[in-house]
Amino acid sequence: MPKMKTNRGAAKRFKVKKSGKIKRGAAYRSHILTKKSQKRKRNLRAPKYVDSTNIKAVRELLAI
């Protein structure tokens, strides 16, 4: 049986850390930023991790 292919879109959006957690980018941070407060934008820079309910699905997309 051939190897599973990695979903390339998912590979660009997620990064697996040494601890096994999967890091992701924050939503609401790409455009229409002028109306968002500095505090809100600063908090969006903080690292975000995939929730435990979604880890299995993301791991399948990443073929790991």
Curated annotation (Swiss-Prot):
GO MF, one annotated term: structural constituent of ribosome
Biological-process GO terms, alphabetical: translation
One GO CC term on file: cytosolic large ribosomal subunit
Domain of life: Bacteria
Disordered: annotated segments: 1-21
Keywords: Ribonucleoprotein, Ribosomal protein
Family affiliation: Belongs to the bacterial ribosomal protein bL35 family.
NCBIfam families: rpmI_bact
Record-linked HAMAP family: Ribosomal_bL35
Protein name listed in UniProt: Large ribosomal subunit protein bL35
Organism: Nautilia profundicola (strain ATCC BAA-1463 / DSM 18972 / AmH)
Gene it is expressed from: rpmI
